């Protein structure tokens, strides 16, 4: 089968398309013939070695397709089932092996590309808004990278929960998308200081929560945006990792809360995984949640997909097709 492999860490140029054997499922596993692959920032972290993996490895952590083989002792999944998955290595390929308990059934009215676009970022938006900091009516939230795949989903879910949403974006075109998703206010951080704008928009009160996937370049000001006992939810680091800092700053700035959540810990039990995924799929099918697939590339052009994602030339989701 064809797979995009990494033999050494580096830029997009290290991605190589190779022929490797089709894997066989072991006990408790299923093999999925992949129809669509989600591209995520975690793929870039792994490619560059920020999140180191033993080389060589097949990149990718998200996809959707059809079960075409199962190993012994598999229940609840059968050959022919349409399924999605997230946080499973080896997705930039034609086939992937997945523990059967980590597969999510895809409803008939959700196509494979939409499922691949929703599994990681949709479930992330769900747990961030329902569990990490459970948004409620009257809350005011700041969402960085508001026109990205996760950002657009976060806006929509936050509005469903009754929150006032402020988004940050880099261009007028991205501001339009964030507004269309439901953001109450959009700040162009390339033209204005987002901290100063937040203070104006909240009459100096500050925010209940900041959802920050950017990291290094936004971290300090994100903390300064918060009200006393506010929450900074740091769920990514697209601008680089946050340098070490003194936790005493959290007390000095208002007894703030800082958390660095991971999808894996918010879907530990299969029941929780299914609940979150089913909510996302049901909202999408009902038209309450719209997923934006911005660009689609053949798997052979994975490097170009990475260049565009890193270069902030995308909005919504980027998909690869095997």
Describe every region a protein language model picked out:
Residues 169, 217-288, 322:
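Glycine-rich phosphate-binding loop and adjacent beta-alpha segment
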Residues 116-192:
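Mid-domain Rossmann-like dinucleotide-binding core that forms the NAD(H)/NADP(H) cofactor-binding site
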């Amino acid at each position: 089968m064809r797979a995009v492999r990494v033999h050494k860490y580096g830029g997009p140029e290290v991605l190589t398309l190779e022929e490797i054997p089709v894997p066989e499922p072991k006990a408790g596993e299923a093999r999925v013939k992949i129809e669509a692959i989600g591209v995520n920032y975690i793929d870039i972290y792994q490619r560059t070695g920020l999140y180191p993996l033993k080389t060589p490895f097949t990149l990718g952590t998200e996809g959707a397709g059809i079960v075409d083989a199962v190993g012994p002792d598999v229940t609840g999944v059968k050959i022919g089932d349409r399924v999605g998955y997230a946080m499973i290595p080896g997705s930039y390929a034609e086939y992937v092996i997945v523990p059967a308990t980590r597969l999510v059934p895809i409803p008939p009215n959700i196509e494979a590309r939409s499922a691949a676009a929703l599994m990681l970022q949709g479930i992330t938006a769900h747990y961030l808004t329902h569990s990490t900091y459970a948004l409620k009516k009257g809350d005011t939230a700041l969402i960085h990278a508001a026109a990205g795949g996760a950002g657009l989903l976060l806006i929509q879910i936050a509005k469903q929960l009754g929150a006032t949403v402020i988004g940050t974006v880099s261009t007028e075109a991205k501001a339009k998308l964030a507004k269309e998703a439901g953001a109450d206010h959009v700040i162009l951080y390339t033209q204005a200081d987002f901290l100063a704008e937040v203070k104006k928009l909240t009459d100096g009160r500050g925010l209940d929560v900041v959802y920050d996937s950017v990291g290094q370049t936004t971290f300090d000001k994100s903390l300064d945006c918060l009200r006393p006992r506010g929450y900074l939810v740091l769920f990514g680091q697209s601008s680089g990792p946050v340098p070490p800092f003194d936790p005493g700053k959290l007390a000095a700035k208002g007894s703030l809360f800082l958390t660095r959540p991971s999808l894996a810990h918010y879907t530990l039990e299969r029941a929780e995984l299914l609940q979150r995924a089913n909510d996302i799929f049901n909202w999408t099918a009902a038209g309450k949640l719209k997923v934006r697939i911005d660009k689609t590339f053949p798997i052979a052009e994975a490097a170009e997909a990475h260049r565009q994602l890193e270069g902030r030339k995308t909005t919504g989701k980027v998909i690869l097709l095997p």
